[in-house]
Amino acid sequence: MSVWRFGNMRNNFQMSQKLSNAHWLKNIFRLFAKKSPMRNAAIDLEAFYHKIDYYFKDATILLQALKHRSYLTKTGEDRFESNERLELLGDAVLGLVVTEHLYKKYPRETEGILTNYKSLLVSGRLLAIIANEIGLGQYILLNESEARAGGRKRSSILADAVEAIIGAIYLDGGLDEARKFIHENITFRLQELLQDEHLRNNKSLLQEYCQSLNLNGPFYRVDEE
Protein backbone atom coordinates (compact mmCIF):
# COMPACT_ATOMS: atom_id res chain seq x y z
CA MET A 1 0.00 0.00 0.00
CA SER A 2 2.81 2.43 0.87
CA VAL A 3 4.55 1.70 -2.48
CA TRP A 4 1.31 2.41 -4.33
CA ARG A 5 0.89 5.69 -2.50
CA PHE A 6 4.44 6.76 -3.32
CA GLY A 7 3.94 5.91 -6.97
CA ASN A 8 0.69 7.79 -6.96
CA MET A 9 2.35 10.85 -5.42
CA ARG A 10 5.11 10.74 -8.03
CA ASN A 11 2.56 10.57 -10.84
CA ASN A 12 0.74 13.51 -9.34
CA PHE A 13 3.93 15.55 -9.35
CA GLN A 14 4.63 14.60 -12.98
CA MET A 15 1.16 15.59 -14.03
CA SER A 16 1.33 18.84 -12.10
CA GLN A 17 4.42 19.93 -14.04
CA LYS A 18 2.17 20.46 -17.03
CA LEU A 19 0.07 22.97 -15.08
CA SER A 20 0.82 26.57 -14.24
CA ASN A 21 3.42 27.28 -11.57
CA ALA A 22 0.77 28.61 -9.23
CA HIS A 23 -1.38 25.48 -9.54
CA TRP A 24 1.66 23.22 -9.18
CA LEU A 25 2.80 24.94 -6.01
CA LYS A 26 -0.71 24.73 -4.56
CA ASN A 27 -0.55 20.94 -4.94
CA ILE A 28 2.82 20.88 -3.15
CA PHE A 29 1.41 22.89 -0.26
CA ARG A 30 -1.53 20.52 0.07
CA LEU A 31 0.76 17.48 0.17
CA PHE A 32 3.09 18.91 2.81
CA ALA A 33 0.65 20.82 5.00
CA LYS A 34 -2.77 19.16 5.06
CA LYS A 35 -3.18 19.73 8.80
CA SER A 36 -1.46 23.09 9.18
CA PRO A 37 -2.45 26.70 8.49
CA MET A 38 -0.76 26.27 5.11
CA ARG A 39 -3.84 24.37 3.86
CA ASN A 40 -5.55 27.76 3.57
CA ALA A 41 -2.48 29.55 2.24
CA ALA A 42 -2.58 27.63 -1.06
CA ILE A 43 -5.95 29.16 -1.82
CA ASP A 44 -4.43 32.64 -1.75
CA LEU A 45 -1.25 31.87 -3.67
CA GLU A 46 -2.30 33.97 -6.66
CA ALA A 47 -2.85 36.89 -4.29
CA PHE A 48 0.63 36.30 -2.84
CA TYR A 49 2.21 36.34 -6.30
CA HIS A 50 0.34 39.56 -7.00
CA LYS A 51 1.56 41.15 -3.78
CA ILE A 52 5.22 40.42 -4.49
CA ASP A 53 4.67 41.23 -8.19
CA TYR A 54 6.65 38.19 -9.30
CA TYR A 55 5.71 34.75 -10.64
CA PHE A 56 8.27 32.01 -10.08
CA LYS A 57 9.41 29.91 -13.02
CA ASP A 58 10.76 27.29 -10.59
CA ALA A 59 8.24 27.13 -7.77
CA THR A 60 10.43 24.79 -5.70
CA ILE A 61 12.72 27.75 -4.99
CA LEU A 62 9.79 29.64 -3.51
CA LEU A 63 8.84 26.58 -1.47
CA GLN A 64 12.32 26.46 0.05
CA ALA A 65 12.25 30.20 0.77
CA LEU A 66 9.14 29.65 2.88
CA LYS A 67 10.52 26.66 4.78
CA HIS A 68 11.64 27.57 8.32
CA ARG A 69 14.18 25.21 9.87
CA SER A 70 11.62 24.05 12.45
CA TYR A 71 9.58 22.53 9.64
CA LEU A 72 12.36 20.05 8.89
CA THR A 73 11.67 18.28 12.20
CA LYS A 74 8.25 17.50 10.79
CA THR A 75 9.35 16.31 7.36
CA GLY A 76 12.71 14.75 8.27
CA GLU A 77 14.40 16.65 5.46
CA ASP A 78 18.07 17.56 5.38
CA ARG A 79 18.98 20.80 7.17
CA PHE A 80 20.03 22.33 3.86
CA GLU A 81 16.38 22.28 2.74
CA SER A 82 15.44 25.16 5.06
CA ASN A 83 15.38 28.79 3.92
CA GLU A 84 18.58 29.74 5.77
CA ARG A 85 20.91 29.57 2.76
CA LEU A 86 18.46 31.61 0.69
CA GLU A 87 18.26 34.06 3.58
CA LEU A 88 22.05 34.54 3.43
CA LEU A 89 21.93 35.08 -0.32
CA GLY A 90 19.00 37.46 -0.06
CA ASP A 91 20.77 39.49 2.62
CA ALA A 92 23.72 39.98 0.26
CA VAL A 93 21.48 40.91 -2.69
CA LEU A 94 19.50 43.32 -0.52
CA GLY A 95 22.70 44.97 0.70
CA LEU A 96 24.02 45.35 -2.85
CA VAL A 97 20.82 46.83 -4.28
CA VAL A 98 20.26 49.21 -1.37
CA THR A 99 23.88 50.40 -1.41
CA GLU A 100 23.77 50.91 -5.18
CA HIS A 101 20.54 52.89 -4.84
CA LEU A 102 21.92 55.12 -2.10
CA TYR A 103 25.21 55.68 -3.94
CA LYS A 104 23.37 56.95 -7.02
CA LYS A 105 20.64 58.90 -5.23
CA TYR A 106 22.88 60.74 -2.76
CA PRO A 107 26.12 61.62 -4.58
CA ARG A 108 27.04 64.32 -2.04
CA GLU A 109 26.61 62.26 1.13
CA THR A 110 29.53 60.74 3.03
CA GLU A 111 30.18 57.04 3.42
CA GLY A 112 29.09 57.24 7.04
CA ILE A 113 25.74 58.84 6.23
CA LEU A 114 25.08 56.29 3.49
CA THR A 115 25.92 53.51 5.91
CA ASN A 116 23.34 54.85 8.35
CA TYR A 117 20.75 55.09 5.58
CA LYS A 118 21.51 51.54 4.56
CA SER A 119 21.15 50.23 8.11
CA LEU A 120 17.63 51.67 8.22
CA LEU A 121 16.59 50.10 4.92
CA VAL A 122 17.93 46.61 5.67
CA SER A 123 16.84 46.51 9.31
CA GLY A 124 15.00 43.48 10.60
CA ARG A 125 12.23 45.71 11.88
CA LEU A 126 11.50 47.13 8.42
CA LEU A 127 11.67 43.70 6.79
CA ALA A 128 9.17 42.38 9.33
CA ILE A 129 6.83 45.27 8.52
CA ILE A 130 7.08 44.43 4.82
CA ALA A 131 6.38 40.77 5.58
CA ASN A 132 3.20 41.77 7.39
CA GLU A 133 2.14 44.03 4.53
CA ILE A 134 2.34 41.21 2.00
CA GLY A 135 0.84 38.65 4.37
CA LEU A 136 3.97 36.50 4.33
CA GLY A 137 3.44 34.95 7.75
CA GLN A 138 0.54 32.76 6.68
CA TYR A 139 2.69 31.13 3.99
CA ILE A 140 5.74 30.29 6.11
CA LEU A 141 6.16 26.56 6.76
CA LEU A 142 6.67 25.87 10.48
CA ASN A 143 6.27 22.83 12.68
CA GLU A 144 3.29 22.74 15.01
CA SER A 145 5.12 23.86 18.15
CA GLU A 146 6.70 26.89 16.46
CA ALA A 147 3.37 27.84 14.93
CA ARG A 148 1.61 27.56 18.30
CA ALA A 149 4.32 29.72 19.87
CA GLY A 150 3.45 32.54 17.48
CA GLY A 151 6.18 31.98 14.92
CA ARG A 152 4.11 33.41 12.10
CA LYS A 153 4.13 36.78 13.86
CA ARG A 154 7.71 36.69 15.17
CA SER A 155 9.68 39.57 13.70
CA SER A 156 12.92 37.63 13.28
CA ILE A 157 11.22 34.81 11.37
CA LEU A 158 9.34 37.27 9.17
CA ALA A 159 12.45 39.33 8.41
CA ASP A 160 14.47 36.22 7.58
CA ALA A 161 11.70 35.03 5.26
CA VAL A 162 11.74 38.33 3.35
CA GLU A 163 15.49 37.95 2.80
CA ALA A 164 14.91 34.37 1.67
CA ILE A 165 12.25 35.55 -0.79
CA ILE A 166 14.71 38.09 -2.19
CA GLY A 167 17.31 35.34 -2.58
CA ALA A 168 14.75 33.11 -4.27
CA ILE A 169 13.71 35.84 -6.72
CA TYR A 170 17.39 36.46 -7.51
CA LEU A 171 18.00 32.78 -8.29
CA ASP A 172 14.79 32.38 -10.28
CA GLY A 173 14.67 35.66 -12.17
CA GLY A 174 18.05 37.33 -11.82
CA LEU A 175 19.29 40.56 -10.30
CA ASP A 176 16.91 42.82 -12.22
CA GLU A 177 13.84 41.08 -10.78
CA ALA A 178 15.31 41.13 -7.28
CA ARG A 179 16.14 44.81 -7.69
CA LYS A 180 12.57 45.48 -8.82
CA PHE A 181 11.15 43.79 -5.70
CA ILE A 182 13.52 45.71 -3.43
CA HIS A 183 12.73 49.07 -5.01
CA GLU A 184 8.98 48.44 -4.93
CA ASN A 185 8.98 47.41 -1.28
CA ILE A 186 12.02 48.89 0.47
CA THR A 187 14.14 51.72 -0.93
CA PHE A 188 11.33 54.26 -1.31
CA ARG A 189 10.77 54.25 2.47
CA LEU A 190 13.93 56.09 3.50
CA GLN A 191 12.41 59.50 4.25
CA GLU A 192 9.68 57.89 6.30
CA LEU A 193 12.29 55.95 8.26
CA LEU A 194 14.39 59.04 8.89
CA GLN A 195 11.40 60.61 10.61
CA ASP A 196 10.87 57.59 12.85
CA GLU A 197 12.47 58.33 16.23
CA HIS A 198 12.61 54.63 17.09
CA LEU A 199 14.74 53.83 14.05
CA ARG A 200 17.06 56.81 13.86
CA ASN A 201 20.51 56.56 15.41
CA ASN A 202 20.77 60.24 16.34
CA LYS A 203 24.21 59.90 17.89
CA SER A 204 25.67 58.42 14.71
CA LEU A 205 23.90 60.98 12.53
CA LEU A 206 25.33 63.85 14.59
CA GLN A 207 28.81 62.38 14.39
CA GLU A 208 28.59 61.94 10.62
CA TYR A 209 27.25 65.47 10.22
CA CYS A 210 30.25 66.86 12.12
CA GLN A 211 32.60 64.82 9.95
CA SER A 212 30.94 66.13 6.78
CA LEU A 213 31.78 69.68 7.94
CA ASN A 214 35.34 68.72 8.90
CA LEU A 215 34.57 69.42 12.55
CA ASN A 216 35.90 67.56 15.55
CA GLY A 217 33.67 64.79 16.81
CA PRO A 218 30.94 65.82 19.27
CA PHE A 219 31.46 65.43 23.01
CA TYR A 220 28.89 63.25 24.81
CA ARG A 221 27.89 63.36 28.46
CA VAL A 222 25.59 60.75 29.94
CA ASP A 223 23.33 62.37 32.54
CA GLU A 224 21.35 59.23 33.34
CA GLU A 225 20.58 55.74 32.04
State where each predicted segment sits.
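Double-stranded RNA-binding/processing signature
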Residues: 1-225
